[in-house]
């Protein structure tokens, strides 16, 4: 399937390219996130000393960006292709250019530019040195050297590549409206467009996000997720010595839920400027605590013997 002919072909080509490089090809995280960076395969795995290479597609939701399906390239639900490489390889820029070639974009025939644009995620307590990747005057990707995630310095530094799949596909296919993208690579009666798959959802979720989401319920959902995250973080320590944490991932799930509730409240227009900053700081504190807990797990770099303390023997329950 030629990547320049279909949205799904583009995804398959990127998966194949990064799999050949040695990345674990993961599936999307099964929660509402605002960007591919929120997937624990990036946010948490970027922390600690262990090497990690992964790539995945992540559906991302930014409720505030919905336009009822009337804008040709602005969506409240869209797709990112995320690559995380730890430690960051010295030739990451060359790897990126080769990935473009794999989807039919020859850097010798197109004007590829890297525009400095340092990245920051206030809710994740994360930042990094970064560049936007422009192709013939249009931004199609971003790559970042993570310096800090969840308030923790990254050592080693991880390299992150984020492809905006819809925008990249529009460029490759030469269309000006996202809903006109060929999704399955077929022609005639068998052709399925991006609009066939997602236009109705864009209209309905825009209506939901801006007009009908229940603000009182969302405020309560935020409080519940915040409380659950704090509860799991406190309960996850194996002992009073706090040497190993056994529930970093369930706690982080609740952090993600709090973040999504905040994004919906923000789209609904029920949070003042002052309150908005307060909510961002509350989510950031959850993310920082989850990151600290992750560093006390085996995957986060804690020694296996330490991380297993407090676990029940197989076949038994605590």
Curated annotation (Swiss-Prot):
What does it catalyze? tRNA(Gly) + glycine + ATP = glycyl-tRNA(Gly) + AMP + diphosphate
One GO cellular component this record assigns the protein to is:
cytosol
- Tell me the compartments it is located in: Cytoplasm
- Kindly state a single biological-process term from the GO annotations of this entry: glycyl-tRNA aminoacylation
Q: Polar residues compositional bias: what residue ranges? A: 300-309
Its top-level enzyme class, in one word, is ligase
Quick check: keyword Zinc-finger in the entry?
A: no
Against CDD domains, the record matches this protein to: GlyRS_alpha_core (cd00733)
Q: Does the keyword Cytoplasm apply?
A: yes
- Alphabetical keyword list: Aminoacyl-tRNA synthetase, ATP-binding, Cytoplasm, Ligase, Nucleotide-binding, Protein biosynthesis
Kindly list the GO molecular function terms attached to this UniProt entry.
ATP binding; glycine-tRNA ligase activity
EC number(s) stated in the UniProt entry for this protein: 6.1.1.14
Main location as per UniProt: cytoplasm
Give the residue ranges for region: Disordered.
298-318
- What family does this chain come from, according to its entry? Belongs to the class-II aminoacyl-tRNA synthetase family.
Which proteins does it associate with, and in what oligomeric form?
Tetramer of two alpha and two beta subunits.
Q: What is this protein called?
A: Glycine--tRNA ligase alpha subunit
Annotated organism of origin = Rhodopseudomonas palustris (strain BisB18)
- Name the gene behind this protein: glyQ
